[in-house]
Amino acid sequence: MASFKIVIVCLALLVAVACARRRDMMSDDELDFHLSKRGIPCACDSDGPDIRSASLSGIVWMGSCPSGWKKCKSYYSIVADCCNQ
């Protein structure tokens, strides 16, 4: 059992080292642009009540909306908000 734990710890360290590779840093504006383009679309209240015909003008942000964005859904969620610029 002890050798199994050692193997698990070694694998965890290997994954941690592999994930800790150097990444290029982006400015906040560039990061916001890239995140907004890769985000999950959501329907704002202004898009209408029917989700099938809505234009999905919002983007789902985890946590809360970043600066320059506003919450566009009337309901409250702890996990994510539907935001648009």
Curated annotation (Swiss-Prot):
Residues 1-20 form the signal peptide. It is found in: Secreted. Nv1 toxin seems to be encoded by 8 different genes. 4 of them code for identical precursors, whereas 4 others code for very similar precursors. In the genome draft, 6 additional loci are also correlated to Nv1 toxin, but they are not predicted to be functional genes. This high similarity may be explained by concerted evolution. The primary structure of the mature peptide is identical in 9 entries (AC B1NWS4, AC B1NWS1, AC B1NWR6, AC P0CH90, AC P0CH46, AC B1NWS8, AC A7SCE5, AC B1NWR7 and AC P0CH45). Additional information can be found in entry AC B1NWS4. Changing residue 9 to A: In Nv1-5, Nv8/Nv19 and Nv1-15. This is N.vectensis toxin 1 3. SUPFAM superfamilies: Defensin-like. Binds to site 3 of voltage-gated sodium channels and inhibits the inactivation process. Is highly active on DmNav1/TipE (drosophila) and is only extremely weakly active on rat Nav1.4-beta-1/SCN4A-SCN1B, and on human Nav1.5-beta-1/SCN5A-beta-1. This reveals high specificity for arthropod over mammalian channels. In vivo, when released into the medium, this recombinant toxin induces impaired swimming, paralysis and death of the crustacean A.nauplii within several hours. Also causes paralysis of cherry shrimps immediately after injection at very low doses. Keywords: Cleavage on pair of basic residues, Disulfide bond, Ion channel impairing toxin, Neurotoxin, Secreted, Signal, Toxin, Voltage-gated sodium channel impairing toxin.
